[in-house]
């Protein structure tokens, strides 16, 4: 298990409060398997993996916002495709 220096991670984010918010968001993604870890898991819990990613500069608040926006756009596109498909099925029935 790798050690995480919270101070180094906080320095990457800006302050410890934003660090907690960013790490919690990322850990939730990892826990729900919505995203793959950007660092080796090494049998660590999602919170430790999130902190390691932040410490290495792979994740920050802006990156998290972009990932979530991309996910929302992909979900909206999938929903629109499903609606179009159902409309076509109904029209042909």
Curated annotation (Swiss-Prot):
GO BP annotation list: DNA-templated transcription
Coiled-coil residue windows: none
Catalyzed chemical reaction(s): RNA(n) + a ribonucleoside 5'-triphosphate = RNA(n+1) + diphosphate
Annotated signal peptide: none
Annotated GO MF terms: DNA binding; DNA-directed RNA polymerase activity
Pfam families, per database record: RNA_pol_Rpb6
Enzyme Commission numbers on file: 2.7.7.6
Domain of life, per lineage: Bacteria
Transcription found in the keyword field: yes
Keywords associated with the record: DNA-directed RNA polymerase, Nucleotidyltransferase, Transcription, Transferase
Cellular component annotations (GO), alphabetically ordered: DNA-directed RNA polymerase complex
Family: Belongs to the RNA polymerase subunit omega family.
Function of the protein: Promotes RNA polymerase assembly. Latches the N- and C-terminal regions of the beta' subunit thereby facilitating its interaction with the beta and alpha subunits.
Subunit structure: The RNAP catalytic core consists of 2 alpha, 1 beta, 1 beta' and 1 omega subunit. When a sigma factor is associated with the core the holoenzyme is formed, which can initiate transcription.
Protein name: DNA-directed RNA polymerase subunit omega
Lineage start: Bacteria, Pseudomonadati, Pseudomonadota, Gammaproteobacteria, Pasteurellales
Gene that specifies this protein: rpoZ
